[in-house]
Design a protein with these regions (language model features):
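RNA/tRNA-interacting regions in translation and RNA-turnover enzymes
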Residues: 1-232
Length: 232
């Protein structure tokens, strides 16, 4: 897997005076192979056994650990997140989850959102890592995934029929049209989510369904964060 990490984004978490070429050199000695640094962006090859570094924070953590081994001062800037309190009302969604496939399933309803263009700094960072900016809601979820390494997906809540989500394995030849407009005939055994009408709305861990996408008419967003069993 190849990822791109802008140096200015990395410095949000990596406190070091090391030049980008030093960071690249010593990182390559510890696991992630930095193929090149171009326009202050690291092009990194991540092996399948080191997906923990497939994010800005992951690379910063690795650099903070390896640079001092070569006499270069570096430390990891702790992640500070605000404590958010929710209403505790979960009646907005009925969720049926196969926990053998997905040990942890979290969903939060955010009402009365305003869909608009993201600020320039956010669009610039997404563009630098190869992600096309779409709108503020979709861009935020992509930003979190690239910064922290936690996949996040947003659904248009009002498009989820029956306010119900069932996470299960797909059946052979079930079909789903994903966000890129492509229709897939599934081989069976994929992790999918269906809504209360039995429609597939997400190919879990891969791409969301076109039929539940956030667009300019979205008013209520379901923020969806999940942890899958790696064996699946």
């Amino acid at each position: 897997m190849d990822i791109k990490i802008p140096d200015n984004w990395l410095r949000d978490f990596l406190r070091s005076k090391a030049a980008s070429n030093e960071v690249a050199k010593y990182l390559s000695l510890s696991g992630p192979s930095v193929e090149k640094v171009e326009n202050s962006v690291y092009f990194i090859e991540v092996t399948t056994n080191r997906v923990d570094i497939a994010s800005v924070l992951g690379v910063a953590r690795e650099a903070a650990a390896i640079l001092p081994q070569f006499g270069v001062k570096a430390r990891l800037q702790p992640v500070k997140l605000p404590l958010l309190r929710f209403s505790g009302d979960v009646s907005y969604l009925e969720a049926q989850v196969n926990h053998a496939l997905c040990p942890r399933f979290s969903a939060v309803l955010i009402k009365n959102v305003q869909i608009k263009e993201s600020p320039e700094w956010l669009k610039a960072r997404l563009t630098a890592v190869g992600v096309r900016p779409i709108n503020n809601i979709v861009d935020i979820s992509n930003y979190v995934m690239h910064e922290l390494g936690q996949p996040v997906h947003t659904f248009d809540y009002d498009k989820i029929k029956g306010a119900k989500m069932v996470l299960r394995e797909s059946k052979k030849k079930e079909k789903l049209t994903t966000l890129d407009g492509k229709t897939h005939s599934l081989p069976g055994g994929d992790i999918v989510i269906e809504d209360g009408a039995g429609r597939l709305i997400d190919l879990a861990g891969i791409m969301g369904g076109e039929n539940s996408a956030v667009d300019e008419g979205t008013k209520n967003v379901l923020l969806f964060v999940q942890t899958y069993n790696p064996q699946n």
